[in-house]
């Protein structure tokens, strides 16, 4: 499928029976229409040729050998007549054999069958639209009870509507005699409905716009009721409101995509192209076949048996017909999802058959293993490690990966700057790792973002853009704050790096995919770049401090204030066990730490700016100390105020640790950097 932007894409959804026929049907020159698979056979046991109207029929799916029909003939050279595209004898079209990779067929089901994905999936789309319990619908689909059609003015056997089992307990006994009568078919077509046909009738009668209007009215009524005080009733009301919202969204989606609800019940079952479910002959007459073929055979056999019974409905008991319809439903369920009916179907070697769902889903499914897990050009892969010195929008690329990814750009710049004369010499310079190569590589990387992806990509934050920087080693460095979006940690996780080439891809990476542009979760809106694990432990250790009581008085508290700096080069008396040092600035405290005079959690007094008040409106000092000259010291829980006799504050000291100082400085620098960047944008 190709969209309006000429992008190839794959879409899974519901299609009409007419579309299924259009995919498969071909008109032969003699007026015959082929496309329906009616026989469960595959290849003839003597000729090893596909059986006509079977699962590998050449008339339906195309020739096995390009341009050669089943008879062994080829199209005459120079033939341009439309009728000469087909063999007059066998009806096989003279086309390339690759058509067997995409040409589909179909099975015309003798009775409607519900699609198991839409009936038993969570949530059940059929149950949501019909607003009925899933168990009741399953009982109706598998023939446990019947549904009475709307009664008319004409005389009828029953004048009921709804589910027999629910409304009248004796209905099963009252209609059971009709099951064995010759006129059961007439009675059933006019009076009752059972199986998937009953579901199809109810879905066809739905008006999606009325469903949206009625659901909205009911939701508003529940919203206006408020809380009743009964926990159980409030819980049921919340569940009902969520269900109504889900039902309105589902109906709106059906309207927007022009999909009819009754398409969830199948009348025609598509048959995959034969090349996607091959049969392989090995030495020793051993045959290896896809499990899908065996499941298709099972469906065709049961469907043919049901068609035979319906043709002879006057002789066949009604119970037998209903039982055969149930078998057809179960066979289609097994084909689509083998585990939907409890225990999966097994072959003679006790091996579980792989259904279509098993082929598609999971890590080894068609999408993740075949389509998404392939190597592509301009990409690399390596283990991720933490890069604490990186900015949020940066990642560290190893030299080996970077030179491989940007090799063509480096060669172009080497030739442009006349450092080399041709590509061969440029590659030699790169191989010899000359200094000019690294200079040009850094210039190229400075203006070119890269994409990092961690599988599985479950949401859009699984792929983010970063500004690459060169690092030593063979691992990719990553800022720890972006790990939550990737659901990654540093215990051996691997990430793939991709290089956007076109200008459109680079612009999209810069405007939409950069990590600093994705700070909130797209699902719930909460911050997703938050500290976790090692960062929280590091912040805790950095700011835990030493839980020691206040030890400050006029004999040891402020011997070096107001402007005298601490002489931390003197190791004699300033930093004893009983004295908490005073520092005029954070730089003095950092200098003392570098000289190992204090530790990260050592309590200290740091002189604070007078314009940054730290006094609470209701906080009172623990103790007030006065000196002979009128100077006083107000000691609080975490700070100290020094004033003169005129009640003027001369200095303020806060009681903190070096860890708190370091954390404060980092936060302050980050805020200042953000403010500068914001002012530049304005």
From Swiss-Prot:
GO terms for molecular function: DNA binding; DNA-directed RNA polymerase activity; magnesium ion binding; zinc ion binding. Its cofactor is Mg(2+); Zn(2+). Keywords: Chloroplast, DNA-directed RNA polymerase, Magnesium, Metal-binding, Nucleotidyltransferase, Plastid, Transcription, Transferase, Zinc. It catalyses: RNA(n) + a ribonucleoside 5'-triphosphate = RNA(n+1) + diphosphate. GO terms for cellular component: chloroplast; DNA-directed RNA polymerase complex; mitochondrion. InterPro entries: DNA-dir_RpoC_beta_prime (IPR045867), RNA_pol_asu (IPR000722), RNA_pol_N (IPR006592), RNA_pol_Rpb1_1 (IPR007080), RNA_pol_Rpb1_3_sf (IPR042102), RNA_pol_Rpb1_clamp_domain (IPR044893), RNApol_RpoC1 (IPR034678). SMART domains: RPOLA_N. Binds 1 Mg(2+) ion per subunit. Binds 1 Zn(2+) ion per subunit. GO terms for biological process: DNA-templated transcription. Its EC number is 2.7.7.6. Pfam families: RNA_pol_Rpb1_1 (PF04997), RNA_pol_Rpb1_2 (PF00623). Mg(2+) binds at residues 489, 491, 493. It comes from the Eukaryota. It is found in: Plastid, Chloroplast. Zn(2+) binds at residues 69, 71, 87, 90. It is an enzyme of class 2 (transferase). Its main location: plastid. In plastids the minimal PEP RNA polymerase catalytic core is composed of four subunits: alpha, beta, beta', and beta''. When a (nuclear-encoded) sigma factor is associated with the core the holoenzyme is formed, which can initiate transcription. Belongs to the RNA polymerase beta' chain family. RpoC1 subfamily. PANTHER family: DNA-DIRECTED RNA POLYMERASE, DNA-DIRECTED RNA POLYMERASE SUBUNIT BETA. DNA-dependent RNA polymerase catalyzes the transcription of DNA into RNA using the four ribonucleoside triphosphates as substrates. This is DNA-directed RNA polymerase subunit beta'.
């Amino acid at each position: 499928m190709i969209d309006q932007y000429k992008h190839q894409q794959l879409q899974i959804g519901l299609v009409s029976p007419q579309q299924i026929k259009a995919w498969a049907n071909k008109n032969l020159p003699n007026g015959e229409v082929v496309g329906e698979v009616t026989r469960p056979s595959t290849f003839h046991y003597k000729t090893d040729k596909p059986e006509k109207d079977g699962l590998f029929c050449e008339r339906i799916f195309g020739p096995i050998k390009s341009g050669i029909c089943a008879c062994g003939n080829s199209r005459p050279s120079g033939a341009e007549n439309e009728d000469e595209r087909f063999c007059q004898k066998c009806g096989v079209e003279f086309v390339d054999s690759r058509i067997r990779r995409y040409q589909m067929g179909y099975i015309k089901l003798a009775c409607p069958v519900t699609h198991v994905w839409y009936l038993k999936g969570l949530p059940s789309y059929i149950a949501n639209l019909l607003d009925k319990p899933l168990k009741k619908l399953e009982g109706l689909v598998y023939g446990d009870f019947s549904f009475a059609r709307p009664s008319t003015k004409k005389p009828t056997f029953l004048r009921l509507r709804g589910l027999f089992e629910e409304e009248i307990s004796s209905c099963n006994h009252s209609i059971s005699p009709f099951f064995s009568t010759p006129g059961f078919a007439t009675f059933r077509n006019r009076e009752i409905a059972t199986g998937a046909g009953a579901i199809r009738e109810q879905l066809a009668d739905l008006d999606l716009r009325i469903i949206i209007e009625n659901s909205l009215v009911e939701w508003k009524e529940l919203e206006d009721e408020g809380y009743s005080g009964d926990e159980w009733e409030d819980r049921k009301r919340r569940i009902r409101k969520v269900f109504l919202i889900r039902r309105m969204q589902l109906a709106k989606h059906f309207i927007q995509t022009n999909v009819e609800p009754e398409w969830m019940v199948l009348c025609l079952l598509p048959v995959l192209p034969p090349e996607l479910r091959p049969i392989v002959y090995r030495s020793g007459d051993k045959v290896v076949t896809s499990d899908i073929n065996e499941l298709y055979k099972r469906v065709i056999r049961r469907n043919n048996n049901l068609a035979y019974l319906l043709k002879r409905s006057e002789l066949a008991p009604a119970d037998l017909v209903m039982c055969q319809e149930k078998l057809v439903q179960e066979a289609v369920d097994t084909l689509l999802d083998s585990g939907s009916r409890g225990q999966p179907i097994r072959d003679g070697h006790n091996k579980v058959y792989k259904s279509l769902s098993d082929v598609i889903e999971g890590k080894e499914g068609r999408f993740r293993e075949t389509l998404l897990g392939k190597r592509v050009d301009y990409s690399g892969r390596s283990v991720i490690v933490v890069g604490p010195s990186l900015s949020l929008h940066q990642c560290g690329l190893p030299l080996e990966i970077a030179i491989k990814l940007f090799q063509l750009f480096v060669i172009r710049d080497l030739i442009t700057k006349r450092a080399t004369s041709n590509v061969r010499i440029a590659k030699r310079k790169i191989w010899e790792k000359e200094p000019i190569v690294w200079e040009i590589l850094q210039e190229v990387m400075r203006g070119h973002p890269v994409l990092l992806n961690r599988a599985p990509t479950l949401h859009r934050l699984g792929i983010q853009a970063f500004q690459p920087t060169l690092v030593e080693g063979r691992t990719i460095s990553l800022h720890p704050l972006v790990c939550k979006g990737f659901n990654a940690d540093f215990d051996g996780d691997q990430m793939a790096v991709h290089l956007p080439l076109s200008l459109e891809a680079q612009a999209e990476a810069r405007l939409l995919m950069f990590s600093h542009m994705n700070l909130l979760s797209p699902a719930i809106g909460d911050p997703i770049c938050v500290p976790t694990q090692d960062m929280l432990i590091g912040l805790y250790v950095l700011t835990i401090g030493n839980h020691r009581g206040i030890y400050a008085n006029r004999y040891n508290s402020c011997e070096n204030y107001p402007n005298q700096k601490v002489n931390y080069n003197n190791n004699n008396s300033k930093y004893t066990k009983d004295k908490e040092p005073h520092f005029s600035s954070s730089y003095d405290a950092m200098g003392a730490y570098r000289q190992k005079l204090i530790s990260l959690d050592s309590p200290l007094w740091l002189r604070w700016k007078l314009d940054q008040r730290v006094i609470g409106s209701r906080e009172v000092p623990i103790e007030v100390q006065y000196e002979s000259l009128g100077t006083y010291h107000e000691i609080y829980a975490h700070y100290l105020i020094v004033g003169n006799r005129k009640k003027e504050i001369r200095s303020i000291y806060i009681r903190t640790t070096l860890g708190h100082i370091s954390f404060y400085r980092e936060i302050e620098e980050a805020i200042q950097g953000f403010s500068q960047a914001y002012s530049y944008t304005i």
